[in-house]
């Protein structure tokens, strides 16, 4: 494995389509208030805003836990238990200098080292071209997280896509629509970052959930998506610029058959943790079935 990443959940071989996943939203799955209150989170946010006035807060889904049903049973195979959190809470917990202490305290107080952490759920894609390459992006030096490192296309599912406003309520977010947002958000991120047309992309298959240990175990759902374009066609679309072109400075293609040994190459240390998680899951869930 790699100390920067851990695997929370691995889906069955080939991955899970949207209809095999369900979500349950509840305030019980939210972050616990910090010991001594949340004043520290607000103080961190205000100091970050002074340094980076372009930052904006937004609601996010919080992953509390995920459970796979025993194989062979009818109905959805994966249950996601989700709460709500925010970007502000992420910076004030997962990214705070006190994150390691918060994990220790959560384990002591609640038997859950993530209890006090925002843990906003991200999405990422192992995106394959028609000529059997996987797509990576070199992150811009301007992005807040992992500047200059190599990543897979990805981002976050957005509660505001289902319920406009800054303070969505759990009861206004039906599980079925949340699962659809999770799966459609990864396609939207690919279109925005790589600039390929939506109709060139297959329906995503969920590979599993990986945790970024450099941001206190923050989780990302990693997917496999097939593109009907060749690597050269994808490169041309990327070079013509998309809505989030500013987030990356270059596109990199690596042969699918190299994935099992990517950890032994000089590219591996350049990968950010979320990309490492996507590759580990791709190799275990999809790589063996292609």
From Swiss-Prot:
Domain of life of the native organism: Eukaryota
Catalysed reaction equations from the record: UDP-sugar + H2O = UMP + alpha-D-aldose 1-phosphate
Presence of the UniProt keyword Hydrolase in the record: yes
Domain Nudix hydrolase: 118-285
Family matches, as PANTHER family: URIDINE DIPHOSPHATE GLUCOSE PYROPHOSPHATASE (PTHR31835), URIDINE DIPHOSPHATE GLUCOSE PYROPHOSPHATASE NUDT22 (PTHR31835:SF1)
Protein residues bound to Mg(2+): 189, 193
Motif (Nudix box): 175-196
Main EC class the enzyme belongs to: hydrolase
Keywords on record: Hydrolase, Magnesium, Metal-binding
EC number of this enzyme: 3.6.1.45
Cofactor requirements of the protein: Mg(2+)
Chain's role: Hydrolyzes UDP-glucose to glucose 1-phosphate and UMP and UDP-galactose to galactose 1-phosphate and UMP. Preferred substrate is UDP-glucose.
GO MF term list: GDP-mannose hydrolase activity; metal ion binding; UDP-sugar diphosphatase activity
InterPro entries found in the cross-reference section: NUDIX_hydrolase_dom, NUDT22/NUDT9-like
Family statement: Belongs to the Nudix family.
Protein name: Uridine diphosphate glucose pyrophosphatase NUDT22
Taxonomic lineage of the native organism: Eukaryota, Metazoa, Chordata, Craniata, Vertebrata
Residues binding substrate, per UniProt: 56, 87, 139, 144, 151, 156, 158, 274
């Amino acid at each position: 494995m790699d100390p920067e990443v851990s695997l929370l959940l691995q889906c069955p071989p080939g991955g899970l389509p949207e209809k095999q996943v369900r979500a349950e939203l509840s305030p019980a799955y939210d972050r616990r208030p910090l010991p001594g209150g949340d004043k520290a989170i607000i103080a961190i946010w205000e100091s970050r805003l002074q340094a980076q006035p372009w930052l904006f807060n937004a609601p996010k889904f919080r992953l509390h836990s995920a459970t796979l049903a025993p194989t062979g049973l009818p109905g959805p195979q994966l249950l996601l238990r989700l709460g709500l959190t925010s970007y502000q809470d992420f910076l004030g917990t997962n990214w705070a200098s006190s994150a390691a202490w918060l994990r220790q305290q959560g384990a002591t107080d609640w038997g859950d080292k993530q209890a006090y952490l925002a843990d906003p759920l991200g999405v990422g894609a192992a995106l394959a071209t028609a000529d059997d390459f996987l797509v990576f992006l070199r992150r811009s030096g301007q992005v807040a997280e992992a500047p200059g490192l190599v990543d897979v296309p990805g981002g976050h599912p957005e509660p505001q896509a289902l319920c406009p406003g800054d303070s969505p309520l759990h009861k206004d977010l039906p599980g079925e629509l949340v699962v659809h947002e999770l799966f459609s958000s990864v396609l939207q991120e690919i279109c925005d970052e790589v600039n390929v047309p939506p109709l060139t992309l297959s329906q995503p298959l969920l590979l599993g959930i990986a945790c970024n240990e450099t941001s206190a175990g923050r989780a990302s759902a990693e997917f496999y998506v097939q593109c009907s374009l060749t690597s050269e066609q994808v490169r041309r679309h990327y070079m013509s610029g998309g809505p989030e072109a500013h987030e990356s400075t270059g596109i990199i293609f690596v042969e699918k058959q190299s994935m099992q040994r990517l950890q032994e190459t000089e590219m591996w240390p350049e990968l950010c943790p979320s990309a490492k998680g996507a590759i580990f899951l791709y190799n275990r869930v999809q790589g063996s079935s292609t």
